[in-house]
Amino acid sequence: MDYSYLNSYDSCVAAMEASAYGDFGACSQPGGFQYSPLRPAFPAAGPPCPALGSSNCALGALRDHQPAPYSAVPYKFFPEPSGLHEKRKQRRIRTTFTSAQLKELERVFAETHYPDIYTREELALKIDLTEARVQVWFQNRRAKFRKQERAASAKGAAGATGAKKGEARCSSEDDDSKESTCSPTPDSTASLPPPPAPSLASPRLSPSPLPAALGSGPGPQPLKGALWAGVAGGGGGGPGTGAAELLKAWQPAEPGPGPFSGVLSSFHRKPGPALKTNLF
């Protein structure tokens, strides 16, 4: 086998030591150097490797080679979201109104709820505010006014409903009391005494309807005679005995079917004395 290429490598190293790394101008060509991970295999047989000189020294090129610096990577890979930044910029500071400004604003609001642009500009100059601030204040004030109106109307409706319910309750209680006083309840009807039934003995004590009921005829004459006979017969004993005899004459000895049965029975029992003692 031919090992002549080993001798050429030794001669190349000797030449490098002789030059003492003095001149790398011819060998330093970093632009033309390219690294390839796939190294070709050594040929089994081929022409001998030429002698390495200062012009084509690969080792000097490796020593002198410096990798190109990496391009500067930006610190922020993604741009900052502009929406959040703009929102922070658009956020306004709350305006604090003084008492004098509020007084002037309320005065204009009492005059009109919707002032025009000229009125707003004049008011803004007067109270040292911007026209936009004045416009926003009027918008908020109108919203507050509408809210107060709705609350007041709801409260009034609730009060009217409560008053109507109270009136209806009072009227129902009055109706109940009237019904309780006018119409008797079953308990009250049970406690009341029953009306007196017409008694059959009442016509016996009243002598006035007897002559009219008996009619014309000889009947009333014996009746009068019997009455006077009873009175005359009891005259000697006193007024009490005469009244007792009179009541006995009126009362029937036996119950009869009619109201005048007692009178008729007494008339039939005492016909003689009645005729004898007739004063008329």
From Swiss-Prot:
Residues 153-163, 199-215 have a biased composition (Low complexity). SMART domains: HOX. It comes from the Eukaryota. Its main location: nucleus. PROSITE patterns: HOMEOBOX_1, HOMEOBOX_2. GO terms for biological process: locus ceruleus development; midbrain development; noradrenergic neuron differentiation; oculomotor nerve formation; parasympathetic nervous system development; regulation of respiratory gaseous exchange; regulation of transcription by RNA polymerase II; somatic motor neuron differentiation. Residues 90-149 bind DNA. GO terms for cellular component: chromatin; nucleus. Gene3D superfamilies: Homeodomain-like. One of its GO terms (molecular function) is sequence-specific double-stranded DNA binding. Pfam families: Homeodomain (PF00046). It is found in: Nucleus. Residues 145-244, 260-280 are annotated as: Disordered. Keywords: Activator, Developmental protein, DNA-binding, Homeobox, Nucleus, Transcription, Transcription regulation. Coiled coil: none annotated. May be involved in regulating the specificity of expression of the catecholamine biosynthetic genes. Acts as a transcription activator/factor. Could maintain the noradrenergic phenotype. Belongs to the paired homeobox family. This is Paired mesoderm homeobox protein 2A. It comes from Mus musculus (Mouse). The gene is Phox2a.
